[in-house]
């Protein structure tokens, strides 16, 4: 676990990255760390996904743009990734119509349960994690063809 000073320094360093260029904060890194508490849960999948889409949108895309397809299931998302699709899109209207936790069809007006989209994201992430476990146990490194 990092000390308070290490956390402050790490956050200050993070804020110097180009991703945060132009962002004005009326608070200091010290104030943020003070409010966090000593235990900071990590959201690894969210952090990895955010970093990947940031890199793609800022020049790492193979084609100079980022194409995407909608996926409603983990199987669809996994097949898209295997086919080379760089990003997966989860549509709110699709969740409203087909995958909300109330098991009913709704218009895309956020009338469905608020945890429906996070539940679909969790299922997609679980599929990706399982595929990663299978590849890793076979000796395949991330990014290998």
Task: Describe these PLM feature segments.
Residues 4, 46, 50, 73, ...:
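Generic structural signal for well-ordered, non-membrane alpha-helical segments
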């Amino acid at each position: 676990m990092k000390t308070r000073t290490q956390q402050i320094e790490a956050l200050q360093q993070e804020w110097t990255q180009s991703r945060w260029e132009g962002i004005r904060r009326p608070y200091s890194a010290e104030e943020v760390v003070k409010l966090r508490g000593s235990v900071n849960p990590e959201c690894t999948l969210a952090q990895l996904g955010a970093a990947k889409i940031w890199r793609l949108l800022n020049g790492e895309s193979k084609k100079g743009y980022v194409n995407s397809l909608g996926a409603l299931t983990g199987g669809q998302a996994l097949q898209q990734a295997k086919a080379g699709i760089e990003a997966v899109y989860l549509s709110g209207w699709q969740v409203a119509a087909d995958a909300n936790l109330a098991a009913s069809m709704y218009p895309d007006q956020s009338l469905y349960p608020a945890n429906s989209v996070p539940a679909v994201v969790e299922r997609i992430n679980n599929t990706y994690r399982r595929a990663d476990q299978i590849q890793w146990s076979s000796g395949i490194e991330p990014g290998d063809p």
